[in-house]
Amino acid sequence: MRPLSVQSKFEDVATSTSVNHHGVTPQSPWHSPVPYLFGGLAAMLGLIAFALLILACSYWRLSSSGEEDGQNVDEEKESRSGDKAANGAYEEKFLVIMAGEDLPRYLATPAMKKCTCGGHEGKMVISQEESVAKEEEKMREGEEEKVKDTGETTTTSH
């Protein structure tokens, strides 16, 4: 006769699961990209919130300093005007990059051409002030000569 072996079902399940666990290691949740995605998103939102907090605090500080009785406002204006005077020389300079290997970068100050056309409204004046004055003198001399020749007086409005 055959020997009878009686085993319960629970023992079979226990032995079969233990065999499967020995061959496969359990997978860590950090092997998935999802935690890294949400972690990066949380870090980015945290940095944005921190920047907004700093911006709000600086705005609050500026608005509260303007509400004072004006005790320190004059001192701040004086210090700001001193800063402007110190930075005035550098304020109107531009970086110019030129072609070449020797000193290709310069700080350039923009030059404005001054208009010398005070009394010549609507006319194009190309000459300098001295030559304009000479031309006006010649015109006056020409008018005086005409007056002497004709003997009549003319009025000129300047």
From Swiss-Prot:
GO terms for cellular component: membrane; nucleus; plasma membrane. One of its GO terms (biological process) is regulation of amino acid metabolic process. A motif (VIMAG) lies at residues 96-100. The keyword NAD does not apply. Residues 1-36 are extracellular. Residues 66-76 have a biased composition (Acidic residues). It comes from the Eukaryota. It is found in: Cell membrane. Ubiquitinated by LOG2 (in vitro). Keywords: Amino-acid transport, Cell membrane, Membrane, Transmembrane, Transmembrane helix, Transport, Ubl conjugation. Residues 131-151 have a biased composition (Basic and acidic residues). Expressed in the vascular tissues and in hydathodes. Expressed in the phloem and xylem (at the protein level). The chain crosses the membrane at residues 37-57. Residues 65-85, 126-158 are annotated as: Disordered. The VIMAG motif is necessary for the function of the protein. Belongs to the GLUTAMINE DUMPER 1 (TC 9.B.60) family. This is Protein GLUTAMINE DUMPER 1. It comes from Arabidopsis thaliana (Mouse-ear cress).
